[in-house]
Amino acid sequence: LPSPDTEERDRLIGGFIAEHIENESTLQLGIGGIPNAVAGALMQKKGMAIHTEMLTDGMVDLFEAGVITRSPRSTDGGLMRGKMVAAFALGTKKLYGFLDRNPGLALMRGTWVNDPYVIAHNRKQVSINTTLEVDLTGQVCSESIGHRQYSGTGGQSDTAIGAQMSEGGKSF
């Protein structure tokens, strides 16, 4: 699946979000132009980890640039030490080549990866997702525009809740 081109507005939003992400954070990036732009804007960060539902090409780029250098702190008793944690991967041939026999990856059940209480044990967990509508009070809708259904939420609500419960965590 080819990566979509990132539009200028996505890059601006991604840059704004990246300014609010600290070094040594644990990342969850959703699907779409903005999460891809955030990954591109994080290239100067240090000591980052991955605990995400979906592993993407942007995360591989962060790993190859030396940004991803640690594993998330989680409730698994050390089983995931030294690994990037995800439930599935979606991307290009480059991503699938990175997955092949990579001992630094742990693809786990989505029910565990997206469990807010597991996520909350990751220090500075940051959840970044795309939404379709935002109202004046800040409520978001990620499934539809008006009455037309576009997608489901997937693990978005779980990862956002887990990030808010995490010490130093944030959700965008």
What are these regions (language model features)?
Residues L1-F172:
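Conserved phosphate- and dinucleotide-binding cores of soluble alpha/beta proteins
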